[in-house]
């Protein structure tokens, strides 16, 4: 009996360990850009042909574009939420087929959820666009001006609650304190999971509603993966350069995930800003005053999704782009570091960086690097950054070629490119077709 109990306890520990590790060892892939809606034959159909390559890069979750009817073709001005056939990316059937293909490779699918604002179908008696259509034969999501925040005076009739977050000028801000809004959006979010097949969400413009609202939807729908867009600015000095201390920005990100709880994470905009400033001859920025990573990953890496660029910051919008000639330094950093790294479609396929990105992702996977991995920064100078992760992987980015004795003798270089190198501890591992 004693032996049986011990065996059961051992199995429980192993199972718990595997579950915890698998929950942390995530890699997100953004499966679209700002121009994807223009794809001949449909974006969903085109992306389906790249499922194998995406899965081979160690991706565990793919972020897909907003799925519903939208006034703007990219999907970020949604109207008839249940109408997936009106999407510029493809039909509902094509979306479900794409999701099934990803699921067949063990990759989960994340919906881009735009619920802060919504575009109306018709005008009311005042001549204001504030009468909404849900996209079904019944009255689900068929709302009027009373479902709009009262302080959104351009559209509201003044009967709703005040906005719980930041305003969005281009479309009506939805009153998430309204019980019907909460009930019907919860039903729609659950429908995306049960009927369409989505596993998680990316919350667009999550600063537009309170953390209490986000928490309510997360707890009601129980998505397996949640990452929010909390796009905040770096702190800057009077000379226009980023300040050495970026605690204010990363504290805002940490506060959001702590308030929402559960699986909720945020994109680490602090790390993105510091990394793209750092690779331009200021790599010292990547270490804070306590010797830790200077972004959100230095404080709460398990809840930070790191990225180099996305459809807003890069692509054709270029609202805050990473230096184009240094993108692989960015991937060498995020794919070897704590946090959940996000690979951007453009870099993987349009920029022909698939081989380099996949090689870095393979190092992450075979060494078990995950969101909570231990980071030890060895060098953080203007022209060189060197760090060790889990005492198994060492990475160098920057223009400096010689980092002296920073690399121990039992570490062997397995991947290198322009201004970056990665070493692994133990026996020499040389990928097929590569010569060191």
From Swiss-Prot:
The active site is at residues 204, 229. Is expressed in all tissues, except in immature seeds. Is the most abundant alpha-amylase isozyme in callus. Ca(2+) 2 binds at residues 133, 136, 138, 142. It catalyses: Endohydrolysis of (1->4)-alpha-D-glucosidic linkages in polysaccharides containing three or more (1->4)-alpha-linked D-glucose units. Residues 1-25 form the signal peptide. One of its GO terms (biological process) is sucrose catabolic process. Its EC number is 3.2.1.1. It is an enzyme of class 3 (hydrolase). InterPro entries: A-amylase_bs_C (IPR012850), A-amylase_pln (IPR013775), Alpha_amylase (IPR006046), Glyco_hydro_13_cat_dom (IPR006047), Glyco_hydro_b (IPR013780), Glycoside_hydrolase_SF (IPR017853). Its cofactor is Ca(2+). SUPFAM superfamilies: (Trans)glycosidases, Glycosyl hydrolase domain. It holds the Pfam family Alpha-amyl_C2. Ca(2+) 1 binds at residues 116, 163, 173, 208. Ca(2+) 3 binds at residues 152, 168, 171, 173. Binds 3 Ca(2+) ions per subunit. The record marks 312 as: Transition state stabilizer. One of its GO terms (molecular function) is alpha-amylase activity. The keyword Calcium applies. Substrate binds at residues 69-71, 76-77, 202-207, 231, 233, 251, 292, 298-300, 311, 317, 396, 401-403, 413-419, 423. PANTHER family: ALPHA-AMYLASE (PTHR43447). Belongs to the glycosyl hydrolase 13 family. Important for breakdown of endosperm starch during germination. Binds starch not only at the active site, but also via accessory binding sites on the protein surface that are important for efficient binding to starch granules and thereby increase enzyme activity. Monomer. This is Alpha-amylase isozyme 3D.
